[in-house]
Amino acid sequence: MVEPLLVLIAASTKLTVYTQDDPTFPESVPAIHDSDLAISWHHSIDTVPTLITVVNGQETDRTFGWSRADWQRLTGLDDLGEDLPVMRPGCGSMSVDPDRVDALRVAFTDTPIISRHVELSSAEDEFEAMYARGWTDGLPVIPPTPERVLRMLAGTTRAPQDVVAIAPPDLVELTVEKIAINAVMAGCLPEYLPWVIAALEAVCTDTFNMHGVLATTMPVGPVIICNGPGTRAIGMNSGINALGQGNRANNTIGRAVQLTIRNVGGGRPGEVDRATHGNPGKISFCFAEDELGSPFTSLGTERGIALGQNAVTVFAGEGPRCVVDQLARTADELTNSLVACLQTVHHPKLVIGFDAILIVSPDHGRLFAQEGWTREQLITQLIERSHTPGEQLVRGARGIAEGIPPHLRDATLPKFRPGGILLTYAGGGAGLFSSIVAGWANSAIGSDPVTRVVGS
């Protein structure tokens, strides 16, 4: 349909034709093959055909697709296309093809990416090359091409060179761009990036003490608890297998945090990371609280976040341990079971120096809901019921060398300090099980939980 029109236009005025996919089209009029789509990109062509009028090197008008009236007006040929339909919509330009647009943006715009580019030879397997360079957590990572990084950066309104934090242990400036690169490698979608940024803001604080979390020989790493309506918007899992595999957002947000600390901050196992055993959560340990199903106010609200805001809370924790109680029929009975299990955090005879997360499941949470227990009430009871006479805790008591100093024999001590239990709610709807995540040393000698609002 177009070629006869081009012949008529070329006969009446100066005409330059650019063709995208077929260099032999049109046969009747000379054409320039826009093989790299540079012309199409720079002229913002989103539909073909597009007809543009140019005067003194400046565009004066354009029309796209086929509109008989518009083509007649732009060419001054009043009878152009009289035998053709009045209008046809045209086709999408190759320059807006989703599979090409990111590469074109990199090729033809001033990219904000300033990180060093690493070129791999055609003989190198990119996945093996990244592993050999020490950029992975032992699992394959996604190659962070400029196209992918630009796409990731579109997930935040922050500028690529904004400094988010100083990343331990090497105390390197951590920019949005560096985070985006590692988020790509972890497998994140762009909409996850604000959550990764917020989590890294939190773990890089002196309060959280990421350097210490790495350097300790204990098996701890960042545990990331996400709150707010955004957790549902990005598809995070707070239900069945919330702490396990299978959910992209949960697993890649946590993984991006760990990869960033490794690749930017220098926190690598065998170097600053000195964990005796470590735990699988040091690859990723991230989940959402089930705020809609919870009988309690949310963890985010408890930590000062306004209702409806998105937030992350980071905690230096080990892997989860299961609490089994299938016989308790009252909140009081279940609380006693939870206390008995919490007493074993790190060691039954060590107290106050360690915090813990208690993840209450729906089946267990139902008992508290039926009796109207609040978050504050449950935490208070857990701490009060964890008090133990010092004579049972001192070194040597019960034939166990481990324990507290002898001068505390006559004291009665709680297992946890005030605020030492983070209560959250998640898990599948079936199973009379809850989970405990033991923490590292707390306060000035260790790590305290940190909460940050998730930005845009």
PLM region spans:
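Non-catalytic, surface beta->alpha helical segment in thiol-disulfide oxidoreductase systems
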Residues: I52-P89
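Surface-exposed, flexible loop/turn segments at secondary-structure boundaries
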Residues: P23, E59, R232
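Short, internal strand/loop/helix patches
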Residues: P26-V55
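Conserved helix-turn-beta segment immediately C-terminal to the redox Cys motif
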Residues: V2-T24
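Long, low-complexity intrinsically disordered regions
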Residues: D83-T111
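Non-transmembrane, aqueous-exposed alpha-helical and coiled segments at domain scale
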Residues: A107-S456
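N-terminal functional module detector in eukaryotic proteins
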Residues: M1, V7, S44, T63-F64
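A generic structural motif
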Residues: L15-Q20, H33-D34, G390-A397
